[in-house]
């Protein structure tokens, strides 16, 4: 399911919260700048921001023909497909729960866990300030809570991401 893979990669690499993901539109993505715009109208911290868009995500978006949709379409409409109608933010969790059940994963693994892991991995690879900025945390202490919760893993120092698309 490539659309769900896209949602997972967005959560992990961009660190955009699920509710915010549900409000993103195709036009919020800049291929030239390799960024995603998060509007203050739906961001948790009520501030406009741009976050980096990993090249693996762009490659998958191109493969899924995301940029053939009108710019005013929501990136994740119903069934995670680009649509003029916004999909409910809970669709990410529902899809995750189905996958988790099939894979027989423990309930401790949540869709939001991808953001936690992304923050930790990015901080270990590029530094806590880069992770703070990508996660749009107002204070580095918030970012440190994510890192301390999971512990620092030396193996992530050569971070190229754990979710790949070839």
Regions found by a protein language model. Give the residues of each.
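Short, basic (Lys/Arg/His-rich) helix/loop patches that form interaction surfaces
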Residues: 1-4, 14, 51, 67-73, ...
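Basic, Lys/Arg- and aromatic-enriched nucleic-acid-binding interface segment
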Residues: 1-18, 44
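Short, charged phosphate-coordinating catalytic segments
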Residues: 11-33
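Short polar/acidic secondary-structure junctions
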Residues: 27-29, 41-43, 66
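A short linear hydrophobic-aromatic micro-motif
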Residues: 36-39, 107-109
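Catalytic-site neighborhood detector that most strongly recognizes the C-terminal catalytic loop/helix
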Residues: 40-42, 46, 135-160
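C-terminal catalytic core of Y-nucleophile DNA break-rejoin enzymes
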Residues: 43-63, 71-98
